[in-house]
Design a protein with these regions (language model features):
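Conserved beta-strand-loop-beta-strand hairpin that lines the nucleotide-binding pocket
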Residues: 1-16, 62-139
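Generic leucine side-chain signal with a strong bias for well-ordered alpha-helical environments
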Residues: 19, 52, 57, 110-112
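STAS-typified acidic loop motif
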Residues: 16-28
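Heptad-repeat coiled-coil signal-transmission/dimerization helices
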Residues: 26-33, 110
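Conserved short strand/loop->alpha-helix "switch" segment adjacent to the catalytic nucleotide/phosphoryl-transfer site
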Residues: 31-55
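Histidine-centered phosphotransfer motif of kinases
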Residues: 49-67
């Protein structure tokens, strides 16, 4: 698998990788997040929430996407933010579930994303979407 880096206005590269739409891709996505954050010299305490967030975003894409692959993206759009995103070919919007059905084992990942990120959202495209979350850079 190939990791690509693109220049960003902050001087930091962005990292992205196309992965198979399967649960095992979450491990590769976590490694990509760790690699990017280490390359940017970010604090160790950002890695755990970043890897948790990307795992949840990948899991959602695995369940809800239509095609055989997804794209994971990690960038630092400003010196104070890291953006983690997963692009898929589904136009179904993610929903933050706040119900407390104790028997429900799926559907609470976005609650974790919401709790650990500075903010999160969805960018819609003609052919699909990107679900992203941002972490504030700690000094």
């Amino acid at each position: 698998m190939t990791v690509t880096a693109t220049p960003r206005p902050t001087g930091h590269p962005g990292y992205s990788q196309t992965l198979p739409r399967e649960p095992e891709s979450a491990a590769t996505a976590r490694r990509l997040v760790r690699t990017a954050m280490a390359a940017w010299g970010l604090e160790q305490d950002m890695i755990e929430p970043g890897t948790l967030i990307i795992s949840e975003l990948v899991s959602n894409a695995v369940v809800h996407s239509r095609l055989a692959s997804i794209r994971v993206m990690v960038s630092q759009p400003t010196p104070s933010l890291v953006r983690l995103g997963v692009v898929d070919r589904s136009k179904v919007l993610p929903m933050l579930r706040t119900d407390s059905d104790g028997d429900q084992i799926h559907g609470r990942g976005l609650v974790l994303v919401d709790g650990f990120s500075h903010r999160w959202g969805t960018d819609l495209y003609r052919w699909g979407k990107q679900v992203w979350a941002e972490l504030e850079v700690t000094s």
